[in-house]
């Protein structure tokens, strides 16, 4: 079911909320199969994407519950593609596993609002890449919010595309979070596209645990942001960047 959102109305924006609950998957879980879309009240299952496959899951409306686990094997990719008008929050409340690519694509239909993906604090064995992107170049942008140590072995990529506007891709830290690596350099121009912020008014810790060089050069702790369904907000909390590995920024 497609939900058309009048984004100018706060009530309508607040109604745009998608929850995705992910159980614990393994490489032995049944194959995901073909590209698909969200269905209402989907039962909990576990799936895997292996063998250098590329699979898309389209989100065509808000207010869905999708309970599944996902293993993404090395060389494979899984894309969650938001097809609404934007300004929605998609919660991924569970553990990923594998070494592949998880791409999160936000749709933005209004310049004053961002779309947000929230990855929970559940333990995870995922050591792949999480790539944040958006359709078009609207300044509302896309947000990835993380917390906890579940993604301590994963790398977040905020590099965007060649036509991505600067600072349109945001990594938000809720209290404290760990990552193996962080990248925001556009491979075509070398321009840094990302920004890292606290998700609220409190100062947040971002710990980088990897051993490679971090190619992040965007802003850290900037106070102005687009905050999904709430529109423009200005949190005062900054970021404590903790280099726990042997990597350098």
Which residues are covered by each model-predicted region?
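N-terminal extracellular ligand-recognition/capping segment immediately after the signal peptide
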Residues: 50-68, 176
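Signal peptide processing junction and immediate N-terminal pro/mature segment
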Residues: 21-22
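Bacterial N-terminal signal peptides that target proteins for export
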Residues: 1-9
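Extracellular repeat-rich scaffold modules on cell surfaces
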Residues: 25-48, 64-157, 188-249
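Short aromatic-glycine motifs in intrinsically disordered, low-complexity regions
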Residues: 167-174
């Amino acid at each position: 079911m497609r939900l058309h959102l009048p984004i100018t109305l706060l009530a309508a924006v607040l109604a745009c909320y998608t929850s995705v609950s992910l159980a614990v998957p393994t490489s032995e879980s049944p194959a995901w199969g073909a590209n698909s879309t969200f269905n209402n009240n989907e039962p909990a299952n576990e799936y895997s994407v292996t063998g250098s496959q590329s699979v898309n899951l389209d989100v065509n409306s808000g207010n869905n519950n999708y309970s599944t686990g996902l293993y993404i094997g090395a060389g494979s990719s899984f894309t969650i593609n938001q097809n609404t008008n934007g300004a929605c929050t998609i919660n991924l409340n569970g553990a990923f596993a594998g070494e592949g690519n998880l791409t999160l694509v936000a749709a933005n239909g209004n310049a004053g609002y961002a779309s947000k993906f929230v990855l929970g604090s559940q333990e995870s064995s995922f050591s792949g890449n999480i790539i944040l992107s958006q359709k078009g170049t609207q300044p509302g942008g896309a947000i990835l919010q993380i917390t906890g140590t579940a993604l301590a072995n994963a790398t977040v990529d905020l590099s965007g595309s060649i036509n991505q506007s600067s600072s349109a891709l945001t990594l938000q830290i809720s209290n404290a979070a760990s990552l193996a690596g962080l990248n925001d350099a556009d491979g075509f121009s070398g321009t840094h596209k990302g920004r890292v912020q606290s998700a609220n008014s409190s100062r947040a810790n971002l710990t980088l645990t990897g051993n490679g060089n971090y190619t992040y050069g965007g802003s850290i702790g900037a106070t102005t942001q687009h905050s999904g369904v709430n529109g423009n907000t200005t949190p005062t909390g900054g970021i404590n960047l903790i280099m726990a590995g042997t990597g350098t920024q």
